[in-house]
Swiss-Prot record:
Gene: RPS7
Subunit and interaction comment: Part of the small ribosomal subunit.
Reported function: One of the primary rRNA binding proteins, it binds directly to 16S-like rRNA where it nucleates assembly of the head domain of the small subunit.
InterPro entries in the cross-refs: Ribosomal_uS7_bac/org-type, Ribosomal_uS7_dom, Ribosomal_uS7_dom_sf
Ribonucleoprotein as UniProt keyword: yes
Subcellular location: Mitochondrion
GO-annotated biological processes: translation
Name of the protein this chain belongs to: Small ribosomal subunit protein uS7m
A Pfam family: Ribosomal_S7
GO molecular function: rRNA binding; structural constituent of ribosome
Keywords for this protein: Mitochondrion, Ribonucleoprotein, Ribosomal protein, RNA-binding, rRNA-binding
Lineage start: Eukaryota, Amoebozoa, Discosea, Longamoebia, Centramoebida
GO cellular component, one term: small ribosomal subunit
Record-stated family: Belongs to the universal ribosomal protein uS7 family.
């Protein structure tokens, strides 16, 4: 349930005479329920009552109409919910409608303040549900335009919206979800190449962020890719991927104790780990005074097979080649290869 019930909710509703009468009746269940709901508004509007300055109760009107209310009750009955919880579900529905209207007004103004207000009221789950729906519609619209969206829309559009929806895209991409309309028509599918690019860019973006400073990492991310586009023009993302393939290590060793002795056993590095290590090397070697330019210079140098990052890779490989004779202990390691 999206909204927490009050402590005295059961005592307030279930011990009333009207409610018991409805539970006993079987034939006129919908009509009797609606009659009770309309007649005893003081019962149903327990959560909406507020006191004025004088001390009198001021009751707010509900947003659901008669027809919508009846349909909602019928749907609950079909789904198999118990009758005694109908009041609760109706109240939940009304509050969610009100919250959506509130969010549409103030979604782009003062996000932090709005978040605090919603969090205090206990609407966190409802807020997430509403916001995710909007973002999925956006991504569906976004991907429908072209296969390579950053080429068709330009760099600014790509950088602006990549950071905003990167996490959502990756979640959808990893589980291989298809974007659908309300009529369940397939809009588009994510290709494997696009998924890999998004994942690699997202890993790099997560590596840049530290202490939750996302705005700073966004600015670094944008400046770096602007510099890359200025030099390499259309193939600026392909250059970044080429750099990762040149730098990433393919082999590494694992330390194991066998018969009371240490052995460094060389193994193949998993793809995800190899890419993440190359990105970590890149970020750690950058100057923290001017990160964007230093990252750009490192990428350019390593594309020419020079620089400190390629030395790291050679050292990594040489350490594993020295312990070549211990490959016979590979059977003791639990690897996916």
């Amino acid at each position: 349930m999206g909204i927490r019930l009050k402590k005295n909710f059961k005592r307030f509703y279930f011990k009333s005479f009207y409610f018991k009468r409805i539970l006993k009746s079987k034939i006129k269940r919908y009509n009797s329920f609606l009659k009770l709901y309309n007649s005893a508004k003081s019962l149903s509007q327990h959560s909406f009552r507020r006191r004025n300055k004088k001390g009198k109760f001021r009751v707010k009107k509900l947003r659901l109409g008669k027809f919508k209310r009846a349909l909602f009750v019928k749907r609950l009955y079909k789904l198999g919910y118990k009758k005694r919880y109908f009041f609760c579900y109706l109240r939940q529905r009304i509050e969610s409608i009100r919250l959506k209207k509130f969010l549409v007004k103030y979604r782009w103004r003062n996000k932090q303040r709005l978040w605090k207000r919603i969090y205090r009221r206990g609407f966190k789950r409802l807020y997430f549900r509403f916001f995710k729906k909007k973002s999925i519609n956006f991504t569906a619209r976004h991907f429908r335009t072209a296969n390579s969206f950053y080429k068709s829309h330009g760099l600014y559009f790509f950088l602006k919206n990549f950071v905003k929806y990167s996490r959502l895209k990756l979640v959808l991409a990893r589980y291989g979800k298809i974007f659908k309309n309300k009529k369940k028509k397939v809009i588009c599918k994510l290709s494997k190449d696009r998924v890999e690019k998004l994942i690699l860019l997202n890993i790099f973006f997560q590596g840049l962020t530290s202490r939750g400073k996302k705005k700073l990492s966004i600015s670094i991310f944008k400046t770096l890719f602007l510099l890359l586009k200025f030099k390499y023009k259309r193939k600026f993302i392909d250059c970044y991927l080429q750099f990762l393939e040149k730098v990433r290590p393919l082999i590494y060793y694992k330390v194991m104790f066998i018969g009371g002795k240490k052995y460094k056993i060389p193994t193949l590095m998993p793809i995800s780990k190899s890419y993440s290590t190359s990105i970590r090397w890149l970020i750690n070697n950058a100057d923290k005074r001017d990160i964007a330019t230093s990252l750009f210079s490192q990428i350019n140098i390593s594309l020419k097979n020079e620089g400190s990052l390629i030395k790291y890779r050679k050292e990594y490989h040489s350490a594993s080649f020295e312990n070549k004779s211990y490959i016979r202990f590979l059977r003791f390691l639990k690897t996916g290869f």
